[in-house]
Amino acid sequence: MGLLGTVAMASHQVALQLAALTFMIPVGVAQATSVVVGQAVGRGEPEAARRAVGAGLVTVTAFMTVTAVTFIAVPVPLARIFSNDQMVVAAAAALLPIAGVFQIFDGLQVASAGALRGVADTRVPMLLNLVGFWLIGLPVSALLGFKLGAGPRGIWWGLAVGIGVVAVLLLWRVRQRFLRSIQRLVIDSTQT
């Protein structure tokens, strides 16, 4: 983003701060989901694990829908919280609706990752993140932002594509893992 100038960088930081602020709630929900899923699996209660996953996904979807609507509906007042420079405010206000678009996907991807962590499924989610962010999102950002000249908005649309792909892939993995039999994990078989 720095290659596009100081206004682009400043507006990116404004939008990123707002997106990061709202992302903290889904991160907390993901952590809670991970713990509750792990406890349910440890107790041998797969239905409780499935309910925890559902509750986590519904919670983040509801919260991020509210933030998405806010980012889309009032981007200028939100940008003004961080800057009084009109060029920065205008540029950030152009990025916030894109952040609004990916808010729901961002919540879903982090909650899905938390649910999968609760059943000790970390390798596949890591690979899915690699595919979505690095092999799809980053090239799309570079293509749109630099090659096609869309600038910061293009970079953010690429980020949105990457987040969307990761969310879909992780939701697929959650469905795959939680619709079948969930086995209790044996961490140390030497304990009695």
Residue ranges: model-predicted function:
Residues 11-75, 107-125:
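Small-residue-rich hydrophobic transmembrane alpha-helices
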Residues 27-30, 99-118, 124-134, 140, ...:
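Short runs within selected transmembrane alpha-helices of multi-pass transporters and secretion channels
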